[in-house]
Amino acid sequence: MSNGALPNRSDVWLQSLGWQPTPEQEQQFERLFQLIVQANQQLNLTRITDPPDFWEKHLWDSLVGIAPWLQPDSSIQRQVSFSVDHSHPLKVIDIGTGGGFPGLPIAIIKPTWRITLLDSTQKKLAFLQQVNAELGLENVETCCDRAENLGQQSPYRESFDLAVIRAVGPASVCAEYALPLLALQGYAVLYRGQWTAEEQEGLVAATSKLGGELIAVSPVKMPHSQGIRHCIYLRKIKTTDPKFPRRVGVPARKPL
């Protein structure tokens, strides 16, 4: 079990995202860290429990994907060539949330947004419900299901403004999970490590079949480890064909 507190990285938040958490949000981040570490031995939530690594790979990494929504000018700061509407709260789904990332950090800093944490493991979701109560988060709900099922169900299908998906599978598979859940003009953020031209070609082809388009690929340097991450942004531009998503397991076995 890891000991110690999260590092204070207020300067890094500001330099990298043009944004800083409030003192209350910093306290919620710290409490989230402690709760994850305490439960980790029983639930196997994450291999990352060292405080600096947790800050970078779970907190900073979760929020870098929504940089365009943090500040009106952050799309310029993050070299993302599109602008978003900051005038209304968003309805968000975190697909395959696991230990609650990126959904919980997003819920902490965006209390007016409605966040749905989707996962197929009820034990993890039961823990996340306890975390929500402990952190006083009233804008989070959990859903135990598979994205392939949820994407075919009302009221979930084509109802979300934003889908975030991290460490779930190949990009084209993530697109099939996410795009059917998005309302028209909704966005999906795919959190990736390395990114290749071949992956991009496959994603563009899959996205076009699902009613979406690839609008930006944003490479970002991690502030502590100096590794490169990529945030892939998709936009829903037309209604998804009713045959998508396909049955549970099919997208992963037979990617578009």
UniProtKB/Swiss-Prot annotation:
Pfam families membership: GidB (PF02527)
Superkingdom of source: Bacteria
GO molecular function, a single term: rRNA (guanine-N7-)-methyltransferase activity
Compartment(s): Cytoplasm
Record keyword Transferase present: yes
Cellular component per GO, a single term: cytosol
EC number(s) reported in the record: 2.1.1.-
Family annotation (PANTHER family): S-ADENOSYL-L-METHIONINE-DEPENDENT METHYLTRANSFERASES SUPERFAMILY PROTEIN
The protein's name: Ribosomal RNA small subunit methyltransferase G
Organism name: Acaryochloris marina (strain MBIC 11017)
Gene that specifies this protein: rsmG
